């Protein structure tokens, strides 16, 4: 199949990634699942020809020298793609990631309403966490899009790579890509405050220096949005503190208690029909009580606080999974498979079912059954 047809098929099917590797057919990832798009495996020669064919001369020289090359390509009438070319077992391969220009909305993603409030907040640090491929970048793009439509100001993003292209709407949106527009996150962040930002988005916090910048931006009155690899809010705080030496831990806990706005953790769970995935969201808000626990480093006390603070907009993964299961959005098996505590969620579902049954029983007490002529089934409540 021609390479351009592969790209077009990827877009039509809603694929996120296209894999070109010798020995297997061209494959794409759709809704988190990798599937072949042809039956014929690619030969080493076909793979090499395809990979080198999307590069310019400079990129070919860089690839020959470094055995790695990252760049973007545009296909007219199809879209833009981020390319990562590499060698594996002395053979050439590449993965293409589709760069989205259609930013999904918070409503389309069915994300909690509290994210709208967080998107418009004036200052503070909001951290999205989750494993690779859990939709952090998509949710963050939706928040940026909401801010862009409903506010004014200057939004600066530093990403590696840029995954969504934002158009200027209410805000001016400056998007800088590491490796193309700047040498590193650290270099870009050092100069960001000179560019009069209102919102700063850091594609990924990978180091102590980047974390220092994120906290400093919040301290100086900016809204800083960032992503971090962690499974839930508690793990995110533990990961942050371990960026720093022990003699700084007390100060870091204090800084987080004063400047953290929220930690939003995310998973993706398949829908019952297998045709899509639903975001499952955990939300920790830095309320006065949460700030006090963070300042003391009592991370283990945050989960119980989240459980009893749903009216303020907080929720745990297990509470979110319970809601999605009761709404028929996910299956029982998938809910348990993604739970922080399968036993707790199982009990929550059991108690919820018993509560519903008790409520129905109380409603029907004292009612009598009467068969009427227009009720052939004989089961109308009077």
From Swiss-Prot:
Chain sites annotated for binding ATP: 133-138
GO MF term set: ATP binding; ATP hydrolysis activity; endodeoxyribonuclease activity, producing 5'-phosphomonoesters
Localization: Cytoplasm
Source organism of this protein record: Pseudomonas aeruginosa (strain ATCC 15692 / DSM 22644 / CIP 104116 / JCM 14847 / LMG 12228 / 1C / PRS 101 / PAO1)
Name under which the protein is recorded: Type IV pilus ATPase PilU
ATP-binding recorded as keyword: yes
Subunit-structure text: Homohexamer. Interacts with PilT.
Gene, per the UniProt record: pilU
GO biological process: type IV pilus-dependent motility
Entry keyword annotation includes Cell membrane: no
PANTHER family to which the protein is assigned, alphabetical: TWITCHING MOTILITY PROTEIN PILT, TYPE IV PILUS ATPASE PILU
Entry-linked NCBIfam families: pilT_fam
